[in-house]
Amino acid sequence: MAKITVVNNQDELYKVINQKKSEGYLETELAVISKSKLHLDDLHNSQISLMATSGSFSDRMSRLLTGEDGEETVLSRYDLTDNELEGYKQDILNDKMLVVANSDRSSHDEVEDNNAAYKEVDITHYAAESEGPKA
């Protein structure tokens, strides 16, 4: 389950990100959701996902035509109740930012078990006639 923290400014944002990292979250498990694009170079150069609900010009035009809600679209990927969704949506519309910490509990054992790259292969070569080891 995603843990969402509402922050009001950049100072709070950095404080919460550092707190989440100290709690053991990886950068790949963190996301920042804001109304408009954030111009923070150190976050752009990290693995923290930055999402703007306003989107690009073409996104805004398509939402205008379809009636789709950008904030709701971004927040729909997290398992939120209707009340939580509305509350976080209002926070975003009020120019606050959300820091989302979502632990990756998936196991990669299946890849190691089924991927040929992880299998040990016997590379002993034998001579064709004797079927013994090559000299």
UniProtKB/Swiss-Prot annotation:
It holds the Pfam family YflT. InterPro entries: GSP17M-like_dom. Belongs to the UPF0355 family. This is UPF0355 protein SERP0066. It comes from Staphylococcus epidermidis (strain ATCC 35984 / DSM 28319 / BCRC 17069 / CCUG 31568 / BM 3577 / RP62A). The lineage of its organism: Bacteria, Bacillati, Bacillota, Bacilli, Bacillales.
